[in-house]
Curated annotation (Swiss-Prot):
The gene is iorB. Catalyzes the ferredoxin-dependent oxidative decarboxylation of arylpyruvates. This is Indolepyruvate oxidoreductase subunit IorB. It catalyses: indole-3-pyruvate + 2 oxidized [2Fe-2S]-[ferredoxin] + CoA = (indol-3-yl)acetyl-CoA + 2 reduced [2Fe-2S]-[ferredoxin] + CO2 + H(+). It comes from the Archaea. InterPro entries: Indolepyruvate_Fd_OxRdtase_bsu, IorB_Oxidoreductase, Pyrv/ketoisovalerate_OxRed_cat, Pyrv_flavodox_OxRed_cen. Its EC number is 1.2.7.8. The keyword Glycosyltransferase does not apply. It comes from Methanothermobacter thermautotrophicus (strain ATCC 29096 / DSM 1053 / JCM 10044 / NBRC 100330 / Delta H).
């Protein structure tokens, strides 16, 4: 089975760490996985995306229209991912907004969240949105937002990795002093996705 995951957001949200955790969880299960990453101006909240391809795939770039899952850490970044989506795609959207640096100086306002949601719903098969920032704060730290999103991915029908595999990879890749907060965030993200 092949499965394509497009992860997008802005610098500082833990996009790459999340992708490494997914990739290493797949490798531990002896599942072929390839990954590519694109860094924007991460120190200024620039766009960051990774493409994770699991299974018997050729190349690290997801062809347009072939993302099974789009894990969008920021709403406007989900719009940038539209070409990767199809009517079969699942989208998990963090609804908390981080206006891009260039938009703060632009006369064009940040699009309303309901417009972003409508655009995504027109393109993808399923869109589940929730405020992952609030969930991360309740779990104990804003920086656990990426684990909220990872938990939501694990709750997605058809996701090829079990929660136990992801948690094992989390333990290998996250500081031990923060593992409890991150585990809470993961479980709360799983619950939020299951409810949305």
């Amino acid at each position: 089975m092949n499965y394509n995951i497009y992860v997008c957001g802005v610098g500082g949200q833990g996009i790459i760490k999340t992708s490494v955790i997914i990739g290493e969880a797949a490798m531990k299960k002896d599942i072929n996985v390839v990954m590519s990453e694109i860094h924007g101006m991460a120190q200024r909240g620039g766009s960051v995306s990774t493409e994770i391809r699991i299974g018997e795939v050729h190349g690290s770039i997801i062809p347009d229209g072939e993302a099974d899952l789009v894990l969008a850490f920021e709403p406007l970044e989900a719009i940038r991912a539209l070409p990767k989506m199809s009517e079969e795609s699942e989208v998990i959207l963090n609804t908390s907004v981080i206006p891009p640096f260039n938009l703060m100086r632009s006369p064009h306002p940040y699009p309303p969240l309901d417009e972003i949601m409508s655009t995504l719903e027109e393109r993808a098969g399923s869109v589940r949105g929730f405020n992952a920032e609030e969930i991360a704060l309740k779990a104990g730290h804003i920086l656990s937002l990426n684990m909220v999103m990872l938990g939501a991915a694990a709750a997605t029908p058809g996701f090829p990795l079990e929660s136990e595999s992801l948690i094992s990879s989390m333990r290998d890749n996250l500081p031990s002093r923060l593992i409890d907060v991150n585990l809470r965030a993961f479980r709360d993200g799983f619950g939020a996705a299951a409810e949305s």
